[in-house]
Amino acid sequence: MVLGTAVALLTSFYGPGFNGNLTANGEIFNQNAATAAHKTLPFGTTLKVCYKGCETVRINDRGPFIGGRQLDISLGTAVRIGLYNRGVDYTTVTRLS
């Protein structure tokens, strides 16, 4: 993912069942925080994720692990950008750092 370039990623969310568990980088997962999981982006990378609204998230976990999905955002971010009711859909994602 090139810095500053917007791409469409198939995005889902996670939270229930994972809240309070350790993320891949050793942090405690907070389902309301502005965080996300990606398979290869370095921990600490920031992304602007847009659906109906936008939010800046920080990569602190690995995933998603369901075929075809490219980004997992926290439950809180899904609610704030309007993806929660849809569940899975393409979002516009821009790498900020």
PLM region spans:
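Secreted/periplasmic proteins
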Residues: V2-S97
